[in-house]
Each structure stands twice: as structure tokens, then as C-alpha cells.
Amino acid sequence: MKRGIQLSKKSKNNKNIKEIESIKKSLVNGELIKNEDALYINNPDYFLTFSDLEISDGIDIIENIMVLSDNYISFNRENEDEPLNDVELMEITEEYKEKNDIEGGYIAQSFDKIDYIINAYDDITVITVISNDLEIQDFYDDLKVVNSWKGFNNAKVDFGQIIILNHAFSPKLLIQLYKVATKQKAKFFESLHLPLHINTILNNDDFLVIASNLPEETLDQDYIMEIGLDITNMEYEDDDIDLEEFIERIEDAVVISCEDALEKINLNIGILDYLVSEGIQIGDMVEVGMSLLENIEPSDELKEKLEKQLLKSISDRNINALLISAVRLEEDLKKGRVREIDINEKPIHFYPDELVGAAIANQIAGTKALLNFRRYSKEKPGILYGLGPILSNTFAGLIAGCMTNILEE
């Protein structure tokens, strides 16, 4: 696409379009406009950008960075059964520009939702566009769980970022900064160690734009008519900055904006989310408890008591912390993150699983629970059999403690 290289003519104003309320925010270089259909940044003095947007040449000279909501795109499509392609997105974007009297070239992206936050740091502005299908629901007492009305097979969590730099940087430097920002964003989310079912739906449709100013001399119309917009021979500010220090500031800006975006959607993780990720359900643990009853027949009343006791025990902050530590230890050992321990070699005198399981059983029901824990640990009925070595004994201790408690009542 050469959408942003040519200077555009003023588009026609369509007076028959229903007026939509828009939010406008001034930026250091440009203006952000957002309504229910789109979010776009307009800079009549032009951006030089490098991006991975759907409608983009990679390197572009444009006046508008546009993000259209999927709802708007869906409403204006002729055939929703076919996948959206770049040509159709371009046509819909052109129509939107015409309806809203938007001038100039553009790069564009479709996005499910277009909530946003702005983080500004002198010469660096980060606009994070947020699309989120997750919510935190109350489950029991203080226990909460992340869920989605779409179900996790269809849910999305995406954070698109537009990083605007109040400098005139060369395409080469923009590409370098794009790589820096992309890598830092990936490192940040990886460092969160989110549960697998959440991590799987995270940032599958995200995007990144790095935008800078054009050198001032290129804004002169006589200069453009005589020289043209030759981005290879412009006078850039690359040598005027401390690159190492600027890269550190970009990295910090990306991390802080991601942290603030997570805070905006209130996405935080608790023990039940880790249980979901491991495929451990309360009902499965109840079945384990019932399977090892001696001289007592399972009953609905007993199952209900065990379920309540399990939830009560998981709500205990001490047990909660032990369970999460076991989940994280299992993951770290599987992925070889602990240099001194290789579980593939079956190290001798290594039994943190038994220590954690025994501690949990004892915390719930005292020393009496340890006998049940040893039996559960040895026989590993039901879901315990399929868990990893750390989690198997950890949850054996949880179930043993809860069973001991309800049978003592």
C-alpha cells in the first residue's frame, strides 16, 4: 500500500451521517479522537511510522493512525461469513474517513474493542488500546476466579500500543525501537507467569506502532514540490540523543503502560485461576475424598460438606500461599528454571511435595490428617494420579486434611 506517501485532497463531508459523540485529547504531536466506532490520532504535520498494522507498508508517512472497532467493521461489511481481508478493511476505513471528514493518508488496524489509556513521559507518549473479554467473578467467601462470558475458547485479551516520539527519527532507528518495544512487551507478559488458559488467549491480535515526527524542512510545501518526500535523505535527530538511555526509557514506558493497562481491566490472578489452568476442579477433589472412605458410604450430604471444607481451606491465606508455591515450583522444575535440581534425574532425598502436602494437611486438621495424607499420597486416586509430582502430594494433603476435618465433626 502507498496509502501514506501521497498528500491527500480534502474529503467530502457527508451531512446525512448521524453524529457520534467523540472524545478528543491533545497530544504533544497530534490529537487523539475516540468514539464508539474508532480511535485515531491525527497529525497534520505528518508522522513517520514503522508498524505491523493490517493496512501499512511497514514504513509510512501519514497523517492518521486509525484503529476501527470490530463492531463498526462488522456492521459495514457486505459478507460477514468471509474472513476480513486488507482490501475490504481499506474500503471500510476510506468510508469512515469520508463520513467523518478526516483528511490525509493513514495506516489502519481492526480491533475487537477500543478502550485505551495514555501514558506520557516528556518526549514519549504511549497509547495502549485495550480489548478484553475477561472479568473477575466472586466464587466463595474471598475467593474469586477469572472468567469470560464468551468462554475461554473464544475470549481475547489484547493490548495494542501506539508509541509516539517527539523526535524526527530515521526509519532505521524506528525499526530498532520497534524491536526493542516488541521484545520488552513480550518479556513483561512472560514474567507474569500467567495461568496457561489465560496466557493462551493473550495478545494474539495485538499491534505496535512506532511514530515520530518528520524533519521540519520536509513540511515546507516548496521543499516537497522540489525534492519530494525522500525519507532516505532527510536530516534526522538520531545523533542528537543518547541512544542507550533512550532505549531504557522506551523499555520503562512499555512496561509501565502494560502494568497500567492490566490495572485498568482489573486483571489479577488467584489460586482458583491456577487450579483451572492445571485442570483441577473442586468436584474432582470431592471424588478423590469419597473414593478412599473406609466403613462409610459416600452421600450427597458428605460430598457437600467436603466441598465447603475444601473451599474454606483454600480461602485460608496460609494454605492458599502453599498451594500457589507448589504450582509455581512444579512449573519451574518442569521448565528447568532451578539450576540445582533436575527432576528428570529423580534426585534422591528430594521430597518438597511431601513436606508441602503434610504441612497443608496439618494446618487443616492437625496430626490426625497425616495418616490420611500418607494413604492418599501412596494410592493417588482420581485426579491425583494425573498431576505432576509436586502437585499430586500437595493436593493429597489438601484433600486429606479436609476429609479428616469433616469426619471428625
Describe the residue ranges of each PLM region.
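Long, hydrophobic, amphipathic alpha-helical segments used as structural scaffolds
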Residues: 189-196, 261, 265, 293, ...
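Glycine-rich, aromatic-bearing surface loops/beta-hairpins
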Residues: 371-409
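Long, charge-patterned amphipathic interaction tracts in eukaryotic proteins
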Residues: 304-375
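Alpha/propeptide regions of enzymes that mature by internal proteolysis
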Residues: 2-264
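Hydrophobic face of amphipathic alpha-helices
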Residues: 246, 250, 254, 258, ...
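N-terminal interaction modules that seed assembly of large macromolecular complexes
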Residues: 268-324
